[in-house]
């Protein structure tokens, strides 16, 4: 059984928020050592070992309806759009941020000041067929479309992704696009094969506190706010997910751009006017139906959570960030509660939101560990760093990627 499946079941069945430093080795020892890899150094493994699904290309004439169906039904994170039918040149990509932007234009829940958006909105109201390309080329904060050859090592890929780039395209021997390699896919591969890489095992017992990663530059929304407000906030800020909190700043759940798929059907548009707290229950129900059980991922970790537990949770939840919340056993560092409102300072509550840890943070740690520049465990309180790219932060002090790969 894959480590991710086993660890996911273990996390949910035990109901634990972390496994301690002393139990990490015992936990990892349950699983066999993979024997099908060409090296015991993860950074030397070819990127082709991340290949788990084919790339899906669309052309400039593909309608929004068709592109959205491909994106959702195939469970993809993005669709490259070729410059013209039959071309290998990539013009841009279509993703959930574009789908969210389109939905807001359709229902009129955003005030688009940009004249280009107004033109598309007018075409929508006139009943014209809108293409995915028309919407995608209006997208905000898009990564450059980067391609790397199939011979690229995971170490080089980690260098690229630690800069905050979320995904790259991998080409085959003929130079044709083969598949997408993402931050999430490299983390999933390393976690599933962790026993094959003994150099990583000492890192697994380090805590979020000792690694000093994360950011207090968090974006959240109240549970009583409407879903439309959450989608609008993500569209305007360019971030990929929001923490949903109650009046005491306690974490209720997470709404991400991917969750826009639950409101794209005409029968579910009414959810846009429901509260975010209600929407969380809808998401839980939908995910439970797909998983065949009444369960939903928990997107929170503690400062005391180990790196191993954090990886396991990222793989199990398939999310792009985890919310750092107050542990029931440890008080937060003064710096971590500086953003809390004066009314909430009478006593920091369990599950109170403190910060966010992103995939970029995690890959930055892996890259720094590979380079030998990861600082040793500190003895002082952690200081969460203010992030970049929305709520994402990274160790710029020990992760300075020079991205010079081919950009299309």
From Swiss-Prot:
Disulfide bonds: none annotated. One of its GO terms (biological process) is signaling. It holds the Pfam family CBS. GO terms for cellular component: cell tip; cytosol; nucleus. Transmembrane segments: none annotated. Keywords: CBS domain, Cytoplasm, Nucleus, Phosphoprotein, Repeat. SMART domains: CBS. SUPFAM superfamilies: CBS-domain pair. It is found in: Cytoplasm; Nucleus. Residues 376-408 are annotated as: Disordered. PROSITE patterns: CBS. Belongs to the SDS23 family. This is Protein sds23/moc1. The gene is sds23.
């Amino acid at each position: 059984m894959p480590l991710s499946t086993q660890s996911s079941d273990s996390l949910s069945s035990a109901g634990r928020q972390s496994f301690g430093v002393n139990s990490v080795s015992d936990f990892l020892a349950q699983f066999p050592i993979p024997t099908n890899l060409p090296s015991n150094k993860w950074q030397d493994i070819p990127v082709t070992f991340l290949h788990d699904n084919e790339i899906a290309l669309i052309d400039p004439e593909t309608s929004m309806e068709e592109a959205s169906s491909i994106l959702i039904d195939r469970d993809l994170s993005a669709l490259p759009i070729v410059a013209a039918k039959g071309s290998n040149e990539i013009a841009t990509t279509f993703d959930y941020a574009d789908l969210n932007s389109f939905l807001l234009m359709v229902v009129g829940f955003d005030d688009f000041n940009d004249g280009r958006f107004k033109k598309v909105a007018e075409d929508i109201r006139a009943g014209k067929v809108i293409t995915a390309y028309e919407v995608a080329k209006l997208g905000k904060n898009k990564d450059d479309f980067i391609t790397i050859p199939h011979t690229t090592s995971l170490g080089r890929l980690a260098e690229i992704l630690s800069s905050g780039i979320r995904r790259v395209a991998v080409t085959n021997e003929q130079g044709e696009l083969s598949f997408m390699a993402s931050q999430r896919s490299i983390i999933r591969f390393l976690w599933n094969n962790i026993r094959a890489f003994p150099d990583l095992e000492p890192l697994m017992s380090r805590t979020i506190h000792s690694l000093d990663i994360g950011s207090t530059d968090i974006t959240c929304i109240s549970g009583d706010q409407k879903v439309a407000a959450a989608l609008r906030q993500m569209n305007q800020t360019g971030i990929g997910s929001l923490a949903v909190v109650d009046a005491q700043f306690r974490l209720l759940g997470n709404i991400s751009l991917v969750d826009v798929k639950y409101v794209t059907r005409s029968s579910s548009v009414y959810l846009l006017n429901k509260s975010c707290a209600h929407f969380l229950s809808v998401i839980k129900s939908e995910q439970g139906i797909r998983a065949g059980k009444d369960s939903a991922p928990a997107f929170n970790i503690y400062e005391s959570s180990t790196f191993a537990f954090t990886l396991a949770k990222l793989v199990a939840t398939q999310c792009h960030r985890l919310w750092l919340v107050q542990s029931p056993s440890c008080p937060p560092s003064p710096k971590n509660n500086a953003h809390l409102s004066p009314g909430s300072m009478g006593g920091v509550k369990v599950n109170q939101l403190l910060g966010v840890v992103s995939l970029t943070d995690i890959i930055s740690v892996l890259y720094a560990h590979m380079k030998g520049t990861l600082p040793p465990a500190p003895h002082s309180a952690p200081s969460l760093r203010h992030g970049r790219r929305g709520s994402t932060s990274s160790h710029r002090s020990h992760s300075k990627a020079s991205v010079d790969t081919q950009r299309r």
